[in-house]
Design a protein with these regions (language model features):
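HotDog/MaoC-like acyl-thioester-processing domains
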Residues: 1-13, 75-140, 218-276
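An N-terminal domain-cap segment
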Residues: 58-74
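Short structured motifs
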Residues: 65-70, 211-218
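Hot-dog-fold acyl-thioester-processing enzymes
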Residues: 1-63, 116-211, 272-276
Length: 276
């Protein structure tokens, strides 16, 4: 077994705390049983970048795959730390802990195609048939849509003011002609198609990320660049407390794949009047 490496402690900012009525809002989150407004898992994923570049090198920008399953929520500026154990098969094990050594998230990292399943892909493969769905009853596997999308420099500038782990490629266009989007911004660029597909869900409800896999196919993803995003429902499930929506999205530039994302969303049953 290769030696585990650890990153520096970080204090991620809850950048969506102002979004009232959502899981990142202190009052709403507390009503649903959380300690406070939660930090998005996509923000936590950014903290792994130094470890990923140390192990995989600059190839990470073009073909890196980070697949994370979220186990426990954190609140604004709660200290967390990343860990990585390289594997002999080209796939690394990655995870994050808080100061009490509780696991916040765990997953896998690799370059390009890998013979082993990713952390989130394995969970999708093992998905059991859904029981009763009320919020998602109008959604079905293989529903899909598409949308044009881009991330502008203003949004990127705002995110960089509070990013946990920055990089020169996020602040300078020297390497790729435009600045590179961080993980949070890559997740954001898939929003237009994702939201269009989610219109079939029956609100109101509060959702939170259960897991995210971001895979660069011909990366990186750049600011102020026009892309097309496709999104498809690839799984529906449930647990005692949530309904679960799985979506897979792909980002295209002039018809060529740039990146894809697999996302698991948990919709809280106790946030929906359909489950009263």
């Amino acid at each position: 077994m290769s030696e585990t490496v650890a990153g520096e402690w970080g204090r991620p900012v809850n950048t969506a705390a102002h979004q009232k009525g959502g899981i990142h809002d202190d009052e709403t989150a507390a009503d649903l049983g959380f300690e406070g407004g939660t930090v998005a898992g996509s923000i936590h994923m950014e903290q792994f970048l130094p470890l990923l570049l140390d192990v995989f090198g600059d190839a990470w920008w073009s073909t890196g795959v980070l697949s994370m399953y979220f186990r426990q929520a954190t609140v604004d500026r709660q200290p967390v730390r990343c860990f990585l154990t390289p594997g002999n098969n080209g796939q690394a094990r990655v995870w994050m802990e808080n100061e009490e050594q509780q696991m916040i998230m765990e997953g896998t990292a690799n370059l390009g195609e890998c013979d082993l399943p990713t952390a989130l892909g394995a969970r999708l493969d093992a998905l059991r048939p859904a029981g009763e769905l009320r919020i998602l009853k109008n959604m079905a596997v293989d529903q899909q849509t598409q949308a044009e999308t881009r991330v502008g420099s203003e949004f990127m500038d705002n995110q960089l003011q509070v990013i946990t782990e920055s990089h020169e490629n996020f602040t300078s266009n020297a390497a790729y002609g435009q600045r590179v989007l961080s993980n949070t911004q890559v997740v954001r660029i898939f929003d237009p198609a994702e939201q269009r597909l989610a219109e079939a869900a029956i609100g109101p409800f509060v959702g939170l990320y259960g897991g995210i896999e971001v895979a660069f196919e011909n990366g990186p993803v750049l600011e102020e660049t026009a892309y097309e995003s496709t999104c498809k429902v690839v799984g529906l499930g449930d647990s005692p407390k949530t309904e679960i929506l799985w979506r897979e999205s792909q980002l295209l530039k002039d018809g060529q794949p740039v990146a894809r994302m697999l996302k698991m969303d948990r919709l809280m049953k106790n946030s929906s009047p359909l489950w009263d």
